[in-house]
A protein has these predicted regions:
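Short, intrinsically disordered low-complexity segments
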Residues: 29-102
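Acidic, proline/glycine-rich low-complexity IDRs
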Residues: 1-23, 28, 32-48, 98, ...
Length: 134
């Protein structure tokens, strides 16, 4: 009896989805600006876009009301390891990207759309830059 009860609990357990980091980097292989990121998303359905051009910020509001925020920064992460990574990826422009981890199903297609228009990649703002979206 004891084993059947345990088996039932295991079957009822919902599969867990790995949480994405909330902080990302968008490493662009072209010298682009916040305006270019906004333009790349103009034809993406189901999002609202807002830009603060002077600050280099683009807000992408998703259909669930949460947002993806792009903040343009200097392509220099101020440490040798990180800058070697940027050089390897041929970074010409860099954006800090903030997402809501619970919106992964909405965020990932947006990231893929951006890199379909602007060559580059998204990577976690983590010690090893993972995960990657190429």
């Amino acid at each position: 009896m004891k084993n059947k009860s345990k088996l039932k609990k295991i079957k009822e357990k919902k599969p867990s989805i790995a949480k994405l980091p909330s902080q990302w980097l968008f490493v662009a292989k072209e010298d682009v600006t916040a305006r270019d990121v906004k333009n790349a998303l103009e034809d993406y359905e189901g999002v609202e876009l807002e830009i603060w051009e002077a600050a280099g910020i683009v807000e992408v509001v998703l259909s669930d009301g949460k947002s993806i925020d792009f903040e343009q920064t200097e392509a220099d992460l101020r440490d040798e390891y990180s800058n070697a990574f940027l050089a390897k990826e041929q970074a010409k422009a860099l954006f800090y990207v903030t997402i809501h981890p619970d919106s992964a199903q909405l965020v990932m297609p947006v990231m893929k759309h951006v890199i379909g228009k602007i060559p580059g990649l998204f990577c976690g703002d983590t010690d090893d830059f993972s995960p990657f979206v190429r």
